[in-house]
């Protein structure tokens, strides 16, 4: 009679099993710590403020309400913010990826003269910034205030992303370029037609980072953009939360400052969901590239 093949876990020594179980328990707790707040925010955005305050989360749908979503989505400025945020994020991502990849390539070449000097210059900028006031004066003198370029250009280049891309380039065998040169490929042909297609994971990773960073950004827009028609989504949502004044009819229904505060709390949850939803939809499509890019960027220092 054939004996059943032991599982990999059963073959492990007792000490390894204990460590593995502890690791899974810690991982499970970590996952719960991430998932539970998200679930709470999603459910709380649909529950009327008073039942939520009195009895907490409930699955009694009679107590659920779309008031917060109706209020936020009925604001015409929210759609302008969505459009602006999408345009800014896409343009910023494209500019950032192009600049980063072009800067990382020569820095990955050991035969590039001045490589160490530029490395030092780049690293210095990671620790010392220009400061808010000097940057504002510079952007003002360049005539970029209240323009899209004020939020696209200053942060388009990231030294950290450049280092990750450089590390990825350095992990690609030099033989690949030598073979391309034998076939008559120029430096430009090698970079655009051979190297970049191999770098899809790191490109997707950098693009994801930059897109998320710009999508969630509001401070630069608050400083440099004065026109309401140019405000991104996060700034619009921030304004809604700060003002959080119900419509006149809603005030007469609730008739108290406490009710307005409860509505503001409900609006807070709804705005979190509205601002995060596009990223939640996008992330699964980039996850495989994101994981590969992170691992590839960590191979070398």
Segments predicted by a language model, with ranges:
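A hydrophobic, multi-pass inner-membrane permease signature
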Residues: 2-301
């Amino acid at each position: 009679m054939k004996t059943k093949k032991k599982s990999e876990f059963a073959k492990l020594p007792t000490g390894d099993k204990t460590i593995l179980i502890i690791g899974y328990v810690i991982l499970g707790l970590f996952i719960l710590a991430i998932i539970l707040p998200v679930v709470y925010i999603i459910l709380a955005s649909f529950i009327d403020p008073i039942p939520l305050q009195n009895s907490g989360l409930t699955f009694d749908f009679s107590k659920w309400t779309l008031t917060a979503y109706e209020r936020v989505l009925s604001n015409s400025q929210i759609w302008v913010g969505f459009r602006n945020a999408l345009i800014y994020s896409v343009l910023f991502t494209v500019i950032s990826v192009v600049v980063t990849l072009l800067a990382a390539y020569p820095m990955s070449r050991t035969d590039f003269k001045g490589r160490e000097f530029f490395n030092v210059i780049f690293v210095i900028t990671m620790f010392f910034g220009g400061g808010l006031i000097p940057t504002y004066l510079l952007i003002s003198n360049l005539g970029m205030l209240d323009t899209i370029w004020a939020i696209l250009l200053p942060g388009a280049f990231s030294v950290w992303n450049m280092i990750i891309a450089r590390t990825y380039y350095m992990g690609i065998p030099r033989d690949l370029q030598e073979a391309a040169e034998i076939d008559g490929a120029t430096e430009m042909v090698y970079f655009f037609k051979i190297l970049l297609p191999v770098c899809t994971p790191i490109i997707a990773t950098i693009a994801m980072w930059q897109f998320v960073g710009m999508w969630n950004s509001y401070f630069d827009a608050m400083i440099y953009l004065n026109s309401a028609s140019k405000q991104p989504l996060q700034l619009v949502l921030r304004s809604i939360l700060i003002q959080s004044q119900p419509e006149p009819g809603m005030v007469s229904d609730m008739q108290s400052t406490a009710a307005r505060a409860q509505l503001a709390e409900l609006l807070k949850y709804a705005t979190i969901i509205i601002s995060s939803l596009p990223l939640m939809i996008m992330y699964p499509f980039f996850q495989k590239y994101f994981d590969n890019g992170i691992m590839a960027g960590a191979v070398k220092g």
